[in-house]
Every structure is written in structure tokens, then in C-alpha cells.
């Protein structure tokens, strides 16, 4: 299994949804970075379950630093982080051992490995993403030391959607972080959709933006910045689509409508618009990075659907009432998208340092 992401700055996540713990090992973090357990609290709180309109599973998601940090400073050696699973309830999954859960990875895992841990999705569960968010905290610290800021936010919920990319600012970050849905969309409309559809789930879109990036992040051909971001984002559970800049809408434009004209002033050369999303030839060009990730509706819903037992018998399937699931995974995916953005950018930043003497 591919459990590692990154080249110079890399992470390896481990653990299952209903195991005793999950965690991550980070390689390539420079020495001397300030780091304490308290640094993880805000980001982990944005991803953790048990909050409004998310899975009722109660996980404190406190991060324990096992290695790579001494006297609150990174040492340059591998950093190992542990997150205990405190609220594991596997009983609701016992009745599912003999049938396939529609929309879940169990069927694929059994086909590939001949065996699967079906408790809460096992390794395929979104629980794994808590490890990515923890690693992303370290990546964000490195980016901030280089004056690079990033933000992800919910830009689509069901039929509600905004395709605008706002300019990143402290006030925007504060607005997103204080929203219960981490969004700029009308919160009352989201709440109404949830209240009117208590037995169903919703898809969503998470947008990400950055401050202007340094020129040169990304490599030609197979190491392009958008390509690496696409791989990072599409590795998130339930992600079903990715675009950068104008994305799919650019296929409906003419060349004259799409082109970003170059302009120049006393600060240098820049673009009049940013439909390219901040990269040309797969390399950052000093513009903000802008993109979006689409997430499917949660597969675990209260409405019945058809499935089969492992012996092929057709059955009417209903998610167990005691199961604990998100009505919209995109809400908590905001923190995960931001973490994967940060991890990708730090890795490319360190790679770029190797391109010139």
C-alpha cells in the first residue's frame, strides 16, 4: 500500500479507524522549527468529529509528539506523531461483516487483498486524515516562516455554490475559521438544507487560495505544481474532482476570453487576471494559487438502498441507526484540503532550493 506522500518533505500515515491509535511520521523537516503539542489544537479542532453537523463520534484528537522534537524545537530527525482513538464503537459494524456497504471501499479492499477491516472503514476511513492535518500543522509553520499563507474554505454545499476566489487576508481567515461550516456561503441556507433532508447527505466543494507564491515552485512535465496538487487532493477520501484556476469552465471559453494578459509596474511583471490559477507550464509564477476540490455525498445515509451479501444474495440495505456519519464530508474536509495544500507546497519549496547553486 502507498502510505507515503512527498519527496523531500514527506509523510507516512498509519493506523485504522477503530484501532487503538493513528499517526504520522514526518521526514525532511528542517531543524530549529518551534513546535509544541498546543500548536496542533486549532487545526485538529477544525477537522475533528463531534461538532455541529458532523459525525457525532467524540474524538479529542490530541496530538502526542513521540520523536523529532526537543525542548519545543524540531531536531531535523523524523517527527513521529500519535493520535489516540478514544471513541471507538465497532458493534454497529458486526452485522455488516457478511454484506457489502454501498459506496464504501470494503468491496475493493477484499478484491485486492482478500481481506478487509470493515470496522468504520478501516484504513479507508476519513479518520486517517487526522494524521494529515497534524502533519499539515508543521508544513504551515514552515510556509509562514517564508511569508506564504494558505486557506481552504467550503465554497459549495449541495446546490449552493460560489466560484469566486477572494483575496487572502487576515479578516478572511478569521471569517472562515469562525464559521461553523468554514464557509463564506449563507449559513442559514445550509442549515435549511440539512433540516429538510435529515435522512440524506450532501456533496460539497472546497476551495483553496494562497498569498502570492514565489516564482519557481513545481517541476517540468511530471512534477508540475497542478499535477502534484491534483494527486494530493484526489487522495482525500470522497474527493471526486479537482480544478485549478478557471478549471473546467475554461473548456467553454475562447482563447481571447481565457488568456491572462501580462502587465508590469514598479513591483515587476504580473498578470491582469488569474484564470491559470497561479501556474504556467506547471510552475508557480508569483501569483496566488487558486483551486477547488469536489466531494461526493456521504455514502452512509438513513435511506434504504439495494446491496448484496457476500454469497451474492440481493438484500435491502440500510445504514445501522447507531452508525456515526457526516451529513456532508466536505465540511471537515476543509482542514484536510488545507493540510494537503501546505504539505505539497513545502515539499516543492524545498525541492526548488535544490535547482540553483
UniProtKB/Swiss-Prot annotation:
Domain of life: Bacteria
Alphabetized GO MF terms: chorismate synthase activity; FMN binding
SUPFAM superfamilies on file: Chorismate synthase, AroC
CDD domains reported for this sequence: Chorismate_synthase
GO cellular component terms, A-Z: cytosol
The protein's annotated pathway: Metabolic intermediate biosynthesis; chorismate biosynthesis; chorismate from D-erythrose 4-phosphate and phosphoenolpyruvate: step 7/7
EC class name: lyase
Cofactor: FMNH2
Residues holding NADP(+): 47
Annotated protein name in UniProt: Chorismate synthase
Amino acid at each position: 500500500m502507498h502510505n507515503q506522500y512527498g519527496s523531500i518533505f514527506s509523510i507516512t500515515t498509519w493506523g485504522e479507524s477503530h484501532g487503538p491509535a493513528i499517526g504520522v511520521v514526518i521526514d525532511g523537516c528542517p531543524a530549529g522549527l518551534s513546535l509544541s503539542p498546543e500548536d496542533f489544537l486549532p487545526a485538529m479542532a477544525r477537522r475533528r468529529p463531534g461538532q455541529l453537523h458532523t459525525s457525532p463520534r467524540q474524538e479529542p484528537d490530541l496530538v502526542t509528539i513521540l520523536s523529532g522534537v526537543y525542548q519545543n524545537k524540531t531536531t531535523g530527525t523524523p517527527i513521529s506523531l500519535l493520535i489516540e482513538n478514544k471513541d471507538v464503537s465497532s458493534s454497529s459494524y458486526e452485522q455488516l461483516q457478511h454484506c457489502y456497504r454501498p459506496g464504501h471501499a470494503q468491496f475493493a479492499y477484499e478484491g485486492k487483498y482478500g481481506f478487509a477491516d470493515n470496522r468504520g472503514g478501516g484504513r479507508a476511513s476519513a479518520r486517517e486524515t487526522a494524521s494529515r492535518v497534524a502533519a499539515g500543522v508543521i508544513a504551515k509553520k514552515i510556509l509562514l516562516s517564508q511569508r506564504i499563507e494558505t486557506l481552504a474554505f467550503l465554497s459549495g454545499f449541495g446546490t449552493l455554490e460560489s466560484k469566486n476566489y477572494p483575496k487572502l487576508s487576515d479578516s478572511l481567515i478569521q471569517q472562515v475559521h469562525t464559521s461553523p461550516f468554514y464557509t463564506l456561503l449563507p449559513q442559514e441556507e445550509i442549515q435549511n438544507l440539512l433540516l429538510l433532508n435529515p435522512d440524506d447527505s450532501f456533496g460539497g466543494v472546497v476551495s483553496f487560495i494562497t498569498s502570492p507564491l514565489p516564482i519557481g515552485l513545481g517541476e517540468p512535465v511530471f512534477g508540475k505544481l497542478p499535477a502534484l496538487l491534483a494527486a494530493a487532493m484526489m487522495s482525500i477520501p470522497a474527493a471526486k474532482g479537482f480544478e485549478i484556476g478557471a478549471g473546467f469552465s475554461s473548456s467553454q471559453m475562447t482563447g481571447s476570453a481565457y488568456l491572462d494578459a501580462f502587465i508590469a509596474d514598479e513591483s515587476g511583471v504580473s498578470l491582469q487576471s488569474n484564470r491559470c490559477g497561479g501556474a504556467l507550464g506547471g510552475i508557480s509564477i508569483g501569483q496566488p494559487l487558486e483551486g477547488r476540490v469536489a466531494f461526493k455525498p456521504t455514502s452512509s445515509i438513513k435511506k434504504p438502498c439495494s446491496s448484496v451479501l457476500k454469497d451474492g444474495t440481493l438484500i435491502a440495505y440500510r445504514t445501522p441507526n447507531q452508525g456515526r456519519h457526516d451529513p456532508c464530508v466536505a465540511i471537515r474536509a476543509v482542514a484536510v484540503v488545507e493540510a494537503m495544500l501546505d504539505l505539497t507546497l513545502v515539499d516543492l519549496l524545498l525541492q526548488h532550493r535544490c535547482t540553483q547553486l
